[in-house]
């Protein structure tokens, strides 16, 4: 029986795996839903997709369903289909595969004869073999067993988006689907088995707004973008790829979708199969990405096929090698149940779409059974650096959203694109290798991947990136051999982002983390400013700033309390944000506000959430993010930041945290006096201005101007999302050199944004000063706060900081864009001078250029290092104050430029000048044009001719300009002096407060000491009393316990007695009943006996009477006989006498 049961179970498992054509209706529906949800999903665009997808049987665990389908559904599907076909072709060359995607599809179809028609659910011929193979592999973890999870359709709803990064499912794409899907380019509709993955696929469409239902960024889902760009910091690397690569919006999208689809399906695939299939799918997706730039269909298909083949081969080779990191194992184990069925569906889909058996099936079959050229080619491609990887690099640039959908891991192919997305630590690994790594990692999560993922991390295995090997996968090193390295997680180029391994799944779509998705990822000690070892210390305060000001007793309080205004809007300092999985713990001085240390990302990490820097988000951060989008700057998590498990969720939006937090922390670390002088100024000014114009930071900064990215999932997400990153000037995105997390790369990080000018977006509601940015040694918020305070003081006009900034930003906004472009081009920001609104006079320009000079910013940064605050607080405070003043001067210069324009206008019309306060920004061009118009309007009958008037006007203008310059200079001096006076007053006030506090300090100390002594005595007495009380209580308790025991004994005895009494009563009753019965019975017997006795007696009497009568008779007879006898005797005697007489007579005779 046991054998029979096991056999039946095994058969069930095989049946679950093998009937690829048998897809539970729920699954098909879920697949359909997912495809429908996918904006660019093949299902959505292809009329036949739904049909194909519906029949899709639960994807074989070994073959994850393709998860994401890009907007270029045709490309994605085709690429998926071709990806398997190209597996064969890839042996020849990726270019060849691209050249002949269609032929490959037929070829692949031939190799997979069992695949059903596009509309038919296909159980690849290889599938039985696969099933056989998979059955031995099948395990609960692989979802091979027939379980509700595998049988039930995986729902498309974005479940806590399982980090799909690795999920690139084996490209099950079947080459033939082209006829099936008119909308798609001969690409089989890819079913996203995993709900989260389906969401990724939905996101796959390049610009599709994120569909993640969770407010937190789902790594799987791109951030919704109002405009062309989605500023998904996680997907910034994608953006970078985007820029670096030719914008193959359709192809990239399709590829991205494909990648996400594959990745997603791979997640659900059982570890071993998924490893192969994922490797195939990832490679295919990588190749698709490569081909995508060239031709959306053929290129994508060919590349995808080639990548798929190589991935399949490599994955086949690598399956045993891959070992997924523990976090991946957990996540995948968790996700596998749902994911595995999806994989089956995906396989079925490809089968349905094209007669070619699903790539996954065919790949294993081809690889194992038939030495199909595809398998060999794929293996070769995997082993080789992967020619396609370069192409995938170009192809990688998908739409940000599509990139997000693909999720760096999913977009393994696309993502591999040489430009690592800024948001992700993109490693320039080959897309194929990246895809392979992602695939392998993902499948490793299910089975082999763990080993490979860990061992094969990017050649550039940044220690921190290891945490986010998913991220690494996202940026798969282009040179990695898919066969071996695909397993390695691609460390995102940003080792600092260091997402938790758990995020591998989540990260691909978005830094979720966490999520995020997410709890599996161990929190790196480096993540926290404080050492984990300190956590055991009862005195250790996880929420306190990591480094305490050496000299400032108040530091602990203020260090944690940074500008409430700034902090309020951007982040809750105590708010645990799983979104910022990596909080820079670089310098103890860095100002980190720990998210709740215990908060786990989405994954439910038990590890304390990493302290998340909560620098206030500012437009500068947005600028940084934008720059990162342009590949010039890379948003990079602090190298020490450890991935915060998310997820899933992890609320996955890592906030880009500029180095500025360090500046803030440094301020915090300054001595009390300095701190009071500097921070109080800063905060006071900010409170004055920021309070007025403070708007809930949740309003996304106007990056929408650049990126139309205003549709972040939530402002809070944006904040966290940006804050978790530090913008670091990226080395060429294509560079594959690992960046040491510890290496001080951050000087490049400090973009020189003029606070008002360079901020890419003038978001009036957003305080540029809101978050300290690395741009200036002092946080911009500090500078702006001071400037704004000064401005308000100068100009009583009650207008919030935003309003004051708008005039400054109106013109500067464009320069900031130029600046960004320049940065993207590699030109120094300083090259772009931001001048007063229309252009300032020479003096104004000179001042602006001097102020804007990067040396001032970078120089300031040089000494505004986080360590400086601790090492030399006074110097730090002084320098910080100087920086703040300098920033104020810069802002004032802009204002002066405006004022100059106003002054020139005032010279023309004093009344008009009075009408416009100096704050009003009037373009000088407009001003002069007005002046010119007024002059021209003079009656034509004027004595002077136009030339004379023009010359006179020029002279007058020159004079006006000179005067304006003088005015601006004097005004500058006045403002500076006034500002200095105000600042000094504030400083003096702070010092006075400090001194006032210090003077009574001694008395307080004495009193407190005495009080402490008294309290100590009282405490001792109380302790003694407490001890006696405790003793008495202990005695009482003992007695009580004894009494309880006695009572319990009595109770037990009573209960026993009661039971006995009841038993006896019952017995008595029973005995009585028996007695009564016996009595009745005895009575009956007695009666019967008496009757019998009476009868007997009657008979006896009768008999006795009879016997007596007979006795008498006999007696009478006896008497008669006796008489007769006596007579006889007498007669005899008489006879004898006679005889004697006779004899005697005879004798005698």
Curated annotation (Swiss-Prot):
Low complexity bias spans: 91-106, 575-590, 652-665
Start-end of Basic and acidic residues biased regions: 358-368
Cellular compartment(s): Cytoplasm; Nucleus; Cytoplasm, Cytoskeleton, Microtubule organizing center, Centrosome
Phosphoserine modification, residue list: 100, 265, 354, 419, 510, 514, 552, 582, 585, 587, 596, 714, 736, 759, 771
GO cellular component: centrosome; cytoplasm; nucleus
Sample GO molecular function, one term: protein domain specific binding
GO process terms (BP): astral microtubule organization; cell population proliferation; cerebral cortex development; interkinetic nuclear migration; microtubule cytoskeleton organization; mitotic spindle organization; neurogenesis; regulation of microtubule-based process
Keyword presence, Coiled coil: yes
Tissues with expression: Expressed in brain, kidney, lung, thymus and ovary. Not detectable in normal tissues at protein level.
Record has Protease as a keyword: no
Pfam families: TACC_C
Domain of life of the organism encoding this protein: Eukaryota
Residue span of region Disordered: 1-73, 91-227, 247-430, 463-617, 636-665, 696-719, 756-780
Cited function: Plays a role in the microtubule-dependent coupling of the nucleus and the centrosome. Involved in the processes that regulate centrosome-mediated interkinetic nuclear migration (INM) of neural progenitors. May play a role in organizing centrosomal microtubules.
Protein name from the UniProt record: Transforming acidic coiled-coil-containing protein 2
């Amino acid at each position: 029986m046991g054998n029979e049961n096991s056999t039946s179970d095994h058969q069930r498992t095989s049946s679950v795996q093998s009937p690829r054509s048998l897809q539970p209706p729920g699954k098909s529906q879920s697949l359909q839903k997912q495809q429908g949800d996918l904006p660019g999903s093949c299902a959505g665009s292809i009329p036949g997709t739904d049909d194909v997808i519906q029949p899709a049987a639960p994807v074989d665990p070994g073959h994850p369903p393709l998860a994401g389908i890009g907007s270029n559904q045709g490309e994605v599907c085709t690429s998926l289909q071709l990806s398997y076909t190209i597996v064969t072709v890839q042996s020849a060359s990726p270019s060849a595969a691209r050249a002949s995607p269609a032929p490959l599809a037929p070829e692949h179809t031939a190799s997979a004869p069992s695949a059903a028609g596009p509309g038919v659910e296909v159980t690849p011929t290889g599938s039985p073999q696969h099933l056989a193979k998979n059955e031995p592999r099948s395990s609960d973890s692989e979802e091979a067993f027939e379980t509700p999870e595998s049988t039930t359709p995986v729902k498309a709803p974005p479940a806590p988006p399982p980090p799909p990064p690795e999920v690139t499912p084996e490209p099950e794409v079947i080459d033939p689907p082209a006829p099936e899907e008119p909308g798609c380019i001969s690409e089989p509709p890819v079913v996203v088995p995993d709900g989260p993955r389906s969401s990724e696929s939905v996101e796959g469409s390049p610009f599709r707004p994120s569909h993640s239902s969770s407010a937190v960024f789902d790594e799987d889902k791109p951030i919704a973008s109002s405009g062309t760009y989605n500023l998904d910091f996680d997907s910034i690397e994608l953006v970078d790829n985007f820029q670096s690569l030719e914008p193959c919006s359709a192809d990239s999208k399709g590829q991205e979708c494909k990648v996400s689809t594959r990745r997603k399906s791979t997640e659900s695939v059982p570890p071993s199969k998924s490893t192969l299939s994922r490797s195939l799918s990832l490679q295919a997706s990588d190749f698709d990405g490569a081909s995508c730039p060239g031709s959306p269909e053929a290129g994508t298909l060919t590349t995808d096929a080639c990548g798929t083949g190589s991935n399949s081969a490599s994955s086949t080779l690598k399956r045993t090698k891959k070992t997924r990191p523990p976090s991946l194992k957990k996540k995948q184990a968790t996700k596998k149940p749902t994911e595995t069925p999806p994989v089956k569906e995906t396989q079925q889909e490809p089968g349905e779409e094209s007669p070619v058996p699903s790539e996954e099936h065919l790949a294993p079959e081809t690889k194992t059974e038939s030495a199909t050229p595809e398998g060999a080619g794929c293996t070769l491609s995997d082993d080789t650096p992967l020619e396609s990887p370069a192409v995938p690099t170009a192809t990688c640039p998908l739409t940000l959203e599509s990139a997000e959908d693909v999720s760096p891991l999913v977009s393994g192919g696309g993502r591999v694109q040489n430009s690592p997305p800024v948001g992700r630590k993109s490693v320039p690994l080959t897309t194929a290798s990246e895809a392979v790594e992602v695939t392998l990692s993902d499948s490793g999560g299910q089975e082999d991947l763990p080993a490979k993922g860990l061992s094969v991390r990017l050649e550039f295995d940044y220690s921190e990136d290891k945490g986010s090997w998913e991220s690494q996968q996202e940026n798969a090193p282009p040179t990695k051999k898919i066969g071996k390295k695909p397993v390695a997680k691609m460390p995102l180029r940003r080792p600092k982002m260091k997402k938790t391994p758990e995020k591998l799944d989540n990260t691909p779509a978005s830094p979720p983390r966490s999520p995020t998705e997410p709890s599996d990822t161990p929190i790196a000690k480096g993540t926290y400013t404080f050492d984990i070892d300190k956590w055991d210390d009862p005195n250790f305060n996880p929420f306190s700033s990591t480094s305490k000001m050496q000299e400032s007793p108040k530091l602990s309080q203020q260090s944690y309390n940074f500008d409430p205004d700034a902090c309020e809007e951007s982040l809750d300092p105590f708010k645990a944000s799983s979104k910022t999985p990596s909080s820079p713990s670089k310098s103890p001085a860095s100002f980190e506000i720990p998210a709740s240390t215990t908060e786990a990302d989405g994954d439910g990490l038990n590890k304390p959430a990493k302290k998340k820097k909560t620098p206030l988000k500012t437009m500068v951060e947005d600028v940084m993010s934008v720059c990162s989008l342009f590949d010039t700057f890379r948003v990079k998590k602090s190298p020490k930041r450890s991935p915060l498990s998310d997820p899933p969720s992890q609320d996955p939006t890592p906030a880009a945290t500029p180095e500025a937090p360090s500046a803030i922390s440094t301020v915090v670390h300054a001595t009390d006096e300095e701190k009071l002088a500097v921070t109080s100024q800063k905060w006071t000014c900010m409170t004055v201005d920021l309070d007025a114009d403070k708007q809930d930071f949740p309003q996304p900064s106007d990056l929408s101007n650049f990126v139309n990215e205003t549709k972040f999932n939530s402002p809070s997400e944006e904040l966290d999302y940006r804050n978790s990153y530090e913008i670091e000037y990226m080395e060429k995105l294509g560079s594959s050199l690992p960046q040491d997390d510890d290496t001080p790369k951050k000087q490049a990080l400090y973009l020189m944004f003029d606070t008002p000018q360079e901020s890419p977006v003038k978001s009036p509601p957003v305080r540029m000063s809101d978050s300290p940015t690395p741009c200036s040694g002092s946080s911009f918020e500090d500078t702006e706060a001071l400037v704004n305070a000064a401005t308000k003081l100068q100009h009583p006009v009650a207008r919030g900081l935003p309003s004051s900034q708008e005039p400054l930003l109106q013109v500067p906004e464009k320069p900031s864009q130029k600046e960004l472009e320049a940065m993207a081009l590699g030109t120094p920001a300083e090259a772009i001078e931001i001048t007063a609104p229309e252009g300032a006079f020479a003096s104004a320009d000179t001042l602006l250029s001097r102020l804007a000079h990067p040396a001032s910013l970078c120089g300031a940064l040089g000494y505004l290092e986080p360590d400086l605050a601790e090492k030399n607080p006074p110097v730090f405070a002084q320098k910080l104050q100087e920086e703040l003043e300098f920033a104020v001067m810069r802002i004032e210069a802009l204002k002066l430029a405006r004022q100059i324009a106003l002054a020139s206008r005032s010279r023309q019309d004093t009344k008009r000048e009075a009408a416009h306060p100096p704050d009003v920004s009037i373009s000088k061009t407009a001003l002069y044009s007005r002046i010119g118009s007024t002059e021209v309007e003079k009656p034509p009958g004027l004595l002077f001719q136009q030339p004379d008037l023009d010359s006179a006007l020029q002279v007058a203008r020159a004079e006006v300009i000179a005067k304006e310059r003088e005015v601006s200079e004097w005004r500058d001096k006045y403002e500076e002096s006034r500002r200095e006076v105000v600042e000094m007053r504030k400083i003096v006030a702070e010092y006075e407060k400090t001194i006032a506090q210090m003077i009574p300090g001694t008395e307080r100390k004495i009193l407190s000491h005495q009080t402490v002594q008294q309290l100590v005595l009282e405490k001792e007495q109380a302790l003694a009393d407490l001890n006696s009380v405790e003793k008495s209580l202990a005695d009482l308790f003992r007695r009580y316990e004894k009494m309880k025991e006695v009572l319990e004994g009595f109770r037990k005895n009573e209960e026993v007695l009661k039971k006995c009494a009841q038993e006896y009563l019952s017995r008595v009753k029973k005995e009585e009943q028996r007695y009564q019965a016996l009595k009745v019975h005895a009575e009956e017997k007695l009666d019967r006996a008496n009757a019998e006795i009476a009868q007997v007696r009657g008979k006896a009497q009768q008999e006795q009477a009879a016997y007596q009568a007979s006795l008498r008779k006999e007696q009478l007879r006896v008497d008669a006989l006796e008489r007769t006898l006596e007579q006889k005797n007498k007669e005899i005697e008489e006879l004898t006498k006679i005889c004697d007489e006779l004899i005697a007579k005879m004798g005698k005779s």
